[in-house]
Each structure stands twice: as C-alpha cells, then as structure tokens.
Design a protein with these regions (language model features):
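Helicase P-loop NTPase motor core
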Residues: 399-401, 408-521, 535
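Conserved helicase C-terminal RecA-like lobe
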Residues: 83-85, 471-474, 486, 496, ...
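Conserved RecA-like helicase ATPase core segment
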Residues: 180, 193-194, 355-442
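Accessory N-terminal region flanking or inserted into the helicase ATPase core
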Residues: 61-115, 235-341
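Short beta-strand-loop-alpha-helix junction that forms the active-site gateway
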Residues: 151-189, 363, 375-377
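Conserved helicase NTPase motor core
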Residues: 1, 6, 88-102, 111-112, ...
C-alpha cells in the first residue's frame, strides 16, 4: 500500500520517549520486584511500623471478608455459594494451632480449641474481636439447662455470659428467608430468649443490622463493658508472630490485592498523598466500607513508599512509571514523530497510563485513533487494565464510530449462543450478536469427578476425545490457576494426604515452560496444560477445563473482586465476579469443537449457571436427577449423614454447617415430595386415626396433610 508504518509495543513506545529526552534513562525493573517487595514488607518491615501493623492485624481479623446484606441474594443458598471457600477459622484457632505446632485440623471440625470455625463473616468478626481483646470464650458451647440441645453462639467463660448473634434487620425481620422460614427463625429466636429468662442466665445479643451500620464491634464493646467484662488486648506483634509469620498462606490472599491496588493506582498517576485524598473523596454512607478502606490504606501506603524507595535505590522504574513519565515528557517537550493514524490492537487491555500517553501524542499530532479489541476478553485488571476505557469509549475520546466484527470461524453457533449468553449476564459488557457457519450439537460436556477420581475422569475424557476425533489433534487443558494440574495429578483428602497418584504415573514428560504434556498411551496426541490467562489468543481442537470448583481459589477466584480495586477503575463494575466471568468466557471459546468441564460435587458458580442453558451433556455420578435440592437454602444438596453419638442416619444439607437444615426421614431422598404449603418440608407417610396419610416433616409448625388416595 506504500504507507509508512511503525509497529511497536507500549513498553517500547514509552521507553523510546524516555531515552530520547533523557541522557541516562533508568532501567526498567523486573515485574516480580513488586510482589517481592510486598511479601518482604509483610514478613519483616511491618514490625517496625506500629500503625501499619495495628491496622493490618485489625483488617485481617475483622475486615478482610465483607458481610454482604442478606437481601442482596435470592436465597440463603446463593449467599452460601458466593461465600463458599472463605476461611472461617478464627484467630484463636490459628494462634493455638501454631503454638502447639500441630495444624492437622479437619476443615469441618467445629467447636474445638484448635480448628475452631464459625458459620458467618459476622461471627468471625465477633470471635476475632473477643480474642484480640483477651476475652476468653467458647464457641457453640452446649447450654447446660433444659431438655433440648441448644448451642448459643458464644459463651464468655470468665463471666458466665452467653452471646447470640441474630441475622435480623432493624425491624426484627429476617426477610432473606421465605415467609415460613422467617417465621421459624423468629420463633426460635424468641424461644432462646425465653430459655435464658427461665433459667436466669445472662444473654447479650447482636444483630446483622449492626454490621450494616458499622457499629457491630462498637456495640459489642459497649455491651461487654456494661456487663463488667475487662479487656486485656493482646500485642499486635505477638498475634503477627504467632499467626502470620508462622503460616505462609495466611497473608497470601492480601498480597494479590495489594499488587492490583498498586498497579492500578500507579496507572492512574496517584501518589501516596493523592491516594489518601482519593479514598476520602470516595467515602459513602457505608461506614463499614469506609473503615475498611482506611485500615487498608494504613498499611498499603507504607508498602508503596517502600516499593518506590527500592526502585530509586536500584535506579529503576517499573512499567507504570515508564508510561507515566513518557506521557509527562510528551506533554512538556512535545512529540518526536507526527502520526496520521494510531491503531491500538487488544484495546480491551488498555490502562489509564497507556491511554494518557496515547492522548498526549494524539493532541500534538492530530492523529486519528483506531482501536481494535473485544471487551468480552478484558482479563488483565491485575496489571492495571481498565475496561471502562473500552466500554465507555465515547466518554473518553468524544465523537467516534463503532464497528462490529461479528463473524467468527472458530466456535460452533451452539457454543457461541451459550458463551454469549453467559458473558452478557454482565450488563456492562457491550451487546453483540456473533455468528458462525459451524454447527455442533452439545458443544459443552460436563464430567463430574469426586475427590478420589479426578485423575481417572481426566484420562477417560482424553480417551473419549481421541476415540471420537483421532490421535492427530490438539487437546488443551486449562486451569484458572497454575496449580490446577496438581489437583488432578495428586489427589488429596481433607487433611491434605495424597490418596491417589494415578495421573502422575501416566505423565511421561511435562514441560512447564511450554505446557507440553506427554501421557502414557497418548504419546502422539498434542496435549498442553496452561492457565486461562496464557491461553488468550490460542485455540485447540478440544478443550478440557480442570478443577471447576466453588472455592476461594476456584473458578471464579473470589479474591479478585475486592471493592477496593473497583474504586480505582474509571467506572466500577457492579456485576459480581465481572473479570472472572470474562476469564471463563475466554476459556469456553478456545475450542474449535467441544469444551469439557470437570466439575466436582462442590461445583463452580459459573458451571451451575451454564447448566440453566441448553446444548450441554452431563456425564458422571452426579447427574442432576440423582440430587435433591435443600428447600431451605435452595442451592445445597440433601445427603445422608450420621449422628456421631447415636449412629442414627438422617438427611442433612451439603452446605452444613452454614445451613443446618435436617430431616429424620431418610426416605425423602428416594421419593421427594416437597410440601406445597411451607415449601421447606417434605411429605412423608404417617399413621393417624383413620389410617395412613402424608404429612409434612415440619409438623407441628406446618400441619399440611394429604390423603394417600389423592
């Protein structure tokens, strides 16, 4: 075409400007330096920052997890699904476990001195508050009076005081439950109060609405002081030494949050002083979130100062500094070359700093701007990318024309229909209607391994793909995290012991750099394992997505969606797990044929959602017809449990202990008939004066009956 063109990366473009205007340009730091600096600060340096240490301990103890309002969910089960994977182990448990040197604690073991896990974020706040202030307590200690088993939430052992936390609003309502369930909940609350009154035991109460107004801990302190409880706060340094320094994973979740926070703040050109003011200007009526942001800043700002000092001492700048400096140089000194057109590829990954650099160049050259990208595939927020610069394009560039390329050649139309419906559940994604000439029934297949046979299921899945398509094809194994392959290679039980190693025996060679995986019996099949982030832009004949479980480090990863990060975006995203949703869309669309989803029993929120669509197949022992949903929480599964004391079998919810619904009639699993009146019990055979009939398991609260003749 005879056009003079120059192709470059943002990295090279920015550094070229710095080299042109500066005689001795600084070197660019290794991208791992930030992570190393944060880790070093949290391990050692923080001990020399009293205010940072105090805020960090308080943040980790009471503010790391956000107690969302119950009415933000359609059911208790939806809330439990979203919160699943949160570490509900108390600080007291972590402290004494590290003191004793033993951490072999079953995750579901409750009410023990070491291994103590509570049932909600608010209970965790209360337990940690009591421990930090030296108030001895027992969690769910059996109440010593009365005929029926009753376990109040907390018992203050030195003061003979009981404490209950009720999930009600200011009007004494539990609107997050169904009408019948709310009535039961409120009735039980009154019964508990009456029991304490009858036996003249002291009961203190806290409520969920306290936390909404960020007065939970203040109210708790006030009540305890009025009741004569003496506070003897533990040393923050002692807490830190016993818990954080002794447990390498305890602070791991916060490192990722701080990394994203620093990258985004630097990309926006916010220095330490500017960040403090920015956060103050962002305050809302939500006092809990305001306090949370303040605590976070108290220890994040010293880390930023430390990181900048390390860069300065090494004579280096990081990528964000480089782009910001280049933009400032263009603004102050002008441009080195005039452009007629600036074309940006992969525009969905643009950051505030990169956009500022391009804007400075455009304003001085009059260049037309052409941006090519797909907002459905914006997955690099942790490096500073800001999707709103794409989705709100006109707001930032003014008059523009938008063109859609909606013809695709990789995926079948059936897979496009599923993946497009999934990604557009986020209303902030641009609406598109992609089309393909390829047709393929059931492009999504589910396989359901349990904790003992994930390796076997993966091998069987590969066998099926080879049997249907031959050995000369490319199979891509995808994981949300790099350790997802380890999950299927080395199966472990709840205590972490290796219980199956089948796939490891099959692995003849694995190249971590390229992802190439050679399995015995499949030597001629091109198999690779990579993370979903690394798969962007790639494709394969068939794709298997591993380890799709609902967990903190599952898919979605629940640590990437923190509101502190959203504040630094040009337009915060309201959709829960928005970036993780885009990442899952990328995973679904890498295949030219089928995508196979390996979903354990505790399956991903995303795979549950896709099962509400059409064009998929389910294989494996967890077929939908075999499962009975818990009518109380809506999303748990009813399973047979056994009373550890009596040995008697009963039916309980898979969400236990967070959903404690249970039934004595195990026959409801073979023929479940949901009670049409209360819709939380089941109809079972009963004997009456006139013979057999069907009655509700919630009797006497629900008196619905049905004659067997009907």
């Amino acid at each position: 075409m005879g056009l003079k063109t120059k192709a470059t990366t943002f990295h090279k473009l920015g550094y070229d400007y710095i080299k042109y205007f500066q005689k001795n340009p600084p070197a660019v730091a290794n991208e791992n330096l930030l992570h190393q600096t944060i880790k070093q600060f949290l391990k050692n340096d923080i001990l020399h920052h009293d205010s940072a240490l105090k805020s960090f301990v308080q943040f980790m103890a009471c503010y790391l997890n956000i107690p969302e309002e119950n009415d933000a969910f359609d059911s208790l089960g939806e809330k439990l699904d979203v919160k699943n994977g949160i570490d509900f182990e108390t600080l007291k448990s972590k402290y004494y476990a590290n003191t004793s040197g033993s951490r072999r604690i079953s995750k579901n073991k409750l009410d023990t001195f070491s291994g103590e896990r509570v049932k909600s974020v608010e209970e965790l706040m209360i337990a940690n508050f009591l421990f930090l202030n030296g108030v001895n307590y027992e969690y769910e200690k059996p109440y010593p009076h009365g005929d029926h088993m009753y376990r109040p939430d907390f018992y203050l052992t030195d003061y003979d005081i009981w404490l209950e936390h009720f999930g009600i609003d200011k009007h004494g309502r539990a609107k997050w439950l169904s009408e019948f369930q709310e009535k039961q909940y409120i009735t039980n609350m009154h019964k508990k109060r009456a029991k304490h009154h009858l036996y003249r035991t002291k009961l203190l109460e806290t409520y969920s609405w306290y936390n909404r107004d960020n007065i939970l801990l203040d109210k708790l302190r006030e009540m305890l002081e009025k009741s004569g409880v003496t506070f003897q706060p533990l040393s923050e340094q002692e807490i830190y030494d016993k818990i954080i320094k002794q447990d390498s994973s305890f602070g791991a979740e916060i490192i990722s949050l701080i990394t994203s926070f620093i990258n985004l703040s630097k990309s926006r050109g916010l220095a330490a002083n500017g960040l403090r003011k920015f956060m103050e200007d962002s305050e809302t009526d939500d006092q809990f979130m305001n306090a949370r942001r303040q605590l976070f800043l108290d220890f994040a700002l010293p880390i930023i100062e430390k990181y900048n000092a390390v860069l300065s001492a090494r004579g280096e700048i990081d990528f964000n500094d480089m782009i910001n400096q280049a933009a400032n140089l263009v603004r102050q000194k002008g441009i080195t070359k005039v452009y007629d057109y600036i074309i940006i590829d992969e525009y969905q990954d643009i950051s505030a700093a990169r956009f500022k650099l391009i804007t400075e160049i455009r304003q001085r050259s009059g260049a037309r701007l052409v941006c090519v990208g797909d907002d459905w595939q914006s997955i690099y927020r942790f490096t500073g990318s800001d999707i709103s610069l794409f989705s709100d394009f006109g707001k930032f560039v003014g008059e523009h024309e938008k063109l859609f390329i909606e013809r695709t050649y990789r995926n079948s139309q059936q897979l496009i229909d599923i993946s497009a419906k999934f990604i557009q559940q986020n209303p902030q994604q641009l609406a598109k209607n992609p089309k393909s000439t390829k047709e393929l029934d059931y492009p999504v297949e589910f396989a359901a391994p349990d904790q003992n046979n994930a390796s076997t299921v993966l091998v069987e899945q590969i066998c099926q793909i080879v049997a249907e398509g031959g050995a000369e094809q490319h199979i891509l194994l995808l994981g949300r995290h790099s350790f997802d392959l380890d999950y299927v290679i080395c199966q472990r039980n709840n205590e972490g012991k290796v219980i199956k190693d089948q796939l490891r025996e099959e692995v003849k060679k694995y190249n971590e750099a390229t992802g190439a995986l050679i399995l015995a019996g499949f030597e001629n099949v091109d198999i690779k394992f990579i993370t979903v982030h690394k798969s962007k832009g790639l494709e394969a004949d068939n794709v298997i997505i591993l380890n799709l479980k609902n967990d903190l480090y599952g898919f979605p990863n629940k640590l990437t969606d923190d509101p502190i990060i959203s504040l630094l975006l040009s337009a915060p995203e309201a959709c829960r797990f928005a970036e993780e949703r885009r990442l899952f869309y990328v995973a679904l669309t890498r295949t030219r044929n089928k995508v196979y989803l390996l979903t354990p029993e505790n399956e991903s929120l995303f795979t549950k959602e896709i099962k509400r669509y059409s064009n998929y197949l389910i294989q494996g022992r967890y077929g939908e017809s075999e499962l009975v949903s818990c009518p109380w929480c809506k999303t748990g599964r009813l399973i047979i449990r056994q009373n550890s004391q009596t040995g008697k079998s009963f039916v309980g919810c898979s969400h236990y202990p967070h959903c404690s619904q249970s039934y004595n009639n195990v026959e409801i699993l073979s023929k479940p008939i949901l009670c049409p009146s209360c819709r939380s019990g089941f109809l079972v055979r009963r004997h009456g004066r006139y013979g057999e009939f069907l009655g509700c398991t919630n009797y006497p609260e629900c008196k619905h009956t049905l004659q067997l003749s009907n």
